[in-house]
């Protein structure tokens, strides 16, 4: 039976530096996210939102505390086990888009579906449809270096969508995009949630996007507070 709680966090702390130079970023985060929820993480720039998102996705570690992802405690896992867990269950879009530089846009987007076991034709058709939806139908054969920053962002989002993950972590998914494109991205995010039950956890400064989520959590002084 799939875990009811996609993410579970207790007493999470994160500090950098040592001694008098030590800086506390997270000071005791508590969080439970149920399967299928949509969560917005908001807060001032530099408050630690991106750091928290990376820890939740198993890409970074806290200094202390417990984090579980799809029912699996991350502190018990080595990086190989975490990578397998992410490949099976997790999609993510961070501000560094992590596109494979030697693959073109279409190949980058179809990769998650191939890893999931879809046929080459299925994965390619799905990837092409997503890229066309995002206005990149004429950029299918372009390498990441040949795309603008906004275009790379859309490719990264399409790749995450094409994996149909159990949970999608997104850092400013509509940042640096015009309102029309941002609204299209938001609609795709919530269709992924609605049609596939994907849990969404996103850092955003976009108040319209945050308002569409089930819960909006503000990171203040290293701890989460629920917004009204």
Curated annotation (Swiss-Prot):
Pfam families: ABC_tran (PF00005). InterPro entries: AAA+_ATPase, ABC_transporter-like_ATP-bd, ABC_transporter-like_CS, MacB-like_ATP-bd, P-loop_NTPase. GO terms for molecular function: ATP binding; ATP hydrolysis activity. Residues 7-228 form the ABC transporter domain. It comes from the Bacteria. Keywords: ATP-binding, Nucleotide-binding, Transport. Gene3D superfamilies: P-loop containing nucleotide triphosphate hydrolases (3.40.50.300). ATP binds at residues 43-50. PANTHER family: ABC TRANSPORTER ATP-BINDING PROTEIN MG467-RELATED, LIPOPROTEIN-RELEASING SYSTEM ATP-BINDING PROTEIN LOLD. Belongs to the ABC transporter superfamily. This is Uncharacterized ABC transporter ATP-binding protein YbbA. It comes from Escherichia coli (strain K12). The lineage of its organism: Bacteria, Pseudomonadati, Pseudomonadota, Gammaproteobacteria, Enterobacterales.
């Amino acid at each position: 039976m799939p875990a009811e709680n996609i993410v579970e966090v207790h007493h999470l702390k994160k500090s950098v530096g040592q001694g008098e130079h030590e800086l506390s970023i997270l000071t005791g985060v508590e969080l439970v996210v149920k399967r299928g929820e949509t969560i917005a993480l908001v807060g001032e720039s530099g408050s630690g939102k991106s750091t928290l998102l990376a820890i939740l996705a198993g890409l970074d570690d806290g200094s202390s505390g417990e984090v579980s992802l799809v029912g699996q405690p991350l502190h018990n896992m080595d990086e190989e086990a975490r990578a397998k867990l992410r490949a099976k269950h997790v999609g993510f879009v961070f501000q560094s888009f992590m596109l494979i530089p030697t693959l073109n846009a279409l190949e980058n987007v179809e990769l998650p579906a191939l890893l999931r076991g879809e046929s080459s034709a299925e994965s390619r058709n799905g990837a092409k449809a997503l890229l066309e939806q995002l206005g990149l139908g004429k950029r299918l054969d372009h390498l990441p270096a040949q795309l603008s920053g906004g275009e790379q962002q859309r490719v990264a989002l399409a790749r995450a969508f094409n994996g149909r993950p159990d949970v999608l972590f997104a850092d400013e998914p509509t940042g640096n995009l015009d309102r029309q494109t941002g609204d299209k991205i938001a609609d795709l995010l919530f269709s992924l949630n609605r049609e596939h039950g994907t849990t969404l956890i996103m850092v955003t400064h976009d108040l319209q996007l945050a308002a569409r989520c089930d819960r909006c959590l503000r990171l203040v002084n290293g701890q989460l507070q629920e917004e009204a």
